[in-house]
């Protein structure tokens, strides 16, 4: 857009006027020059980006984010203005960074440990100063994070391998539940149910209706994505956000019922089990006065949605990549046979599965699901020579950074990109530092366990030659396949058998 190309400039009006110019023209030119200066001026910034344009620039940049989605808009602006640039969201200065050195600086410092988003939007979805994912109150976030870290490490991490494998095998034995009339597998639904079942087994342990909860999780995610950066005026028109409010309420009500049952069971027990699960830890924290009941429910909600929301889509993309790259599948199967053999995968196998690990890393680099991180500066700072004021919003465009620096073949899917160790400043699928993903270690365990268990039993194939590159996707808060425009089903062929589910 033309307005976005108008950057702050210095005009020397008199040098542009010919000597023979009529005297009456001079005031007009001076006024025009003054107008242009005001038009493009917000306070001179050394950071590249669209012009302020008497407030029109911020409206256009925010509008672009709402129209294109956060991820697509970030890629657009980085292409237009470079890897460190400035826009506005809700009138607030926002930096979009895809430069590794700048990203490293932001991730490692505590004064970037807060997130940003519409306060009204976060209140609507229950994340404003609650839970862990978008809790932008650093003090309250520090109260909940240790509870998540404890649940996602130690005994929970060790048990995850067996729990994942058992859950997946159970669901694979009931494939007809996610198989259509043509014999094609609804892989995303399968993976989401497995992820939810695994999370419930480890962290809540209350019987639930998987399909109903998975459906409500998708509705909640759609609301979260839609409301995160909406302007305040949006929330003054009830019919605009009513459907999102209902989607949020549906999931929150379901979690309330599950947690009420958990509280009832805890009260009925004479003695707590030796290994206390996450839900019990939350309820005990509530009884101590550390957390409110509402915050407890929000923490449980976020623990249950994390894997079905992001990890299931990551695994879905991985299966599509395996289907397109038989040489990669062959290398993975060879390693599985060598490390695991004919038995079930165990915790001791996880570190030995290097080919599987490199495949996961390359998949997350080449086709990420979460390819951006949103932060807020809590104090004045300087990043790579650019001044950053307290309160500045920051979006780290991780997906773009993974395609710009270090990797020998950044625009290709190949395990050669991880043939040698990659310095962690150049590869951050989970982030690092004080606000890194709390579940980054257990996520790797889950993905390895799922891939080994599934690929040992089935060869996977896409429909009609569909591949990751050809899938229609939405790129907003996260990058998801668009089920309305692409064929997302797959064919599962049992290994060591001529029988195929497509027949």
UniProtKB/Swiss-Prot annotation:
Q: Which GO terms describe its cellular component?
A: endoplasmic reticulum; membrane
Q: Could you say which EC number(s) this protein's record lists?
A: 1.14.14.14
Q: Where in the cell is it found?
A: Membrane
InterPro entries per the UniProt record, alphabetical? Cyt_P450, Cyt_P450_CS, Cyt_P450_E_grp-I, Cyt_P450_sf, Cytochrome_P450_Monoox
* Main localization of the protein described in the UniProt heading: membrane
GO terms for MF: aromatase activity; heme binding; iron ion binding
- Catalytic activity, reaction form: testosterone + 3 reduced [NADPH--hemoprotein reductase] + 3 O2 = 17beta-estradiol + formate + 3 oxidized [NADPH--hemoprotein reductase] + 4 H2O + 4 H(+); androst-4-ene-3,17-dione + 3 reduced [NADPH--hemoprotein reductase] + 3 O2 = estrone + formate + 3 oxidized [NADPH--hemoprotein reductase] + 4 H2O + 4 H(+)
Gene Ontology process terms (BP): female gonad development; lipid metabolic process; response to estradiol
According to its UniProt record, which cofactors does this protein need?
Answer: heme
Which residues are noted in the entry as heme-binding?
437
Task: Summarize the protein's role.
Answer: Catalyzes the formation of aromatic C18 estrogens from C19 androgens.
Its family remark reads: Belongs to the cytochrome P450 family.
Query: What is this protein's record name?
Result: Aromatase
